[in-house]
Amino acid sequence: MKYQQLENLESGWKWKYLVKKHREGELITRYVEASAAQEAVNLLLALENEPVRVNVWIDRHMNPALLNRMKQTIRARRKRHFNAEHQHTRKKSIDLEFMVWQRLAGLAQRRGKTLSETIVQLIEDAEHKEKYATTMSTLKQDLQALLGKK
């Protein structure tokens, strides 16, 4: 395992995940009967500040179909948490208009690269173009100076 598991922190994430799914209308309990499901949800809501008991609730009451998705979500959250500790691995976000994002995503897909790699490539292309234009301008001025002197 690449990232250390922190039980208290991850239990809090699990609690937030389950509460969010419940508020979105998903069935988070294994119970078909509405009253039993609501009772289990009420119990979960009362466990907000008791992370160790959240894991017990998950073992007893959680919908098994939700287990895999929750594990994936927690694994991704753990990765982001540990990557955020170092500047070079921390993810940054930028606001893009949808059309810009769509064009960038299309370009990245055509090039077979990630969005970040595509952006770096576009920046490098622009820098090379700028350097080429400067070099050509200098050569043109030098050539004019040589021809103008004679």
Curated annotation (Swiss-Prot):
Required for spatial organization of the terminus region of the chromosome (Ter macrodomain) during the cell cycle. Prevents early segregation of duplicated Ter macrodomains during cell division. Binds specifically to matS, which is a 13 bp signature motif repeated within the Ter macrodomain. Pfam families: MatP, MatP_C. Its main location: cytoplasm. It comes from Salmonella arizonae (strain ATCC BAA-731 / CDC346-86 / RSK2980). The keyword Thylakoid does not apply. This is Macrodomain Ter protein. One of its GO terms (molecular function) is sequence-specific DNA binding. Keywords: Cell cycle, Cell division, Cytoplasm, DNA-binding.
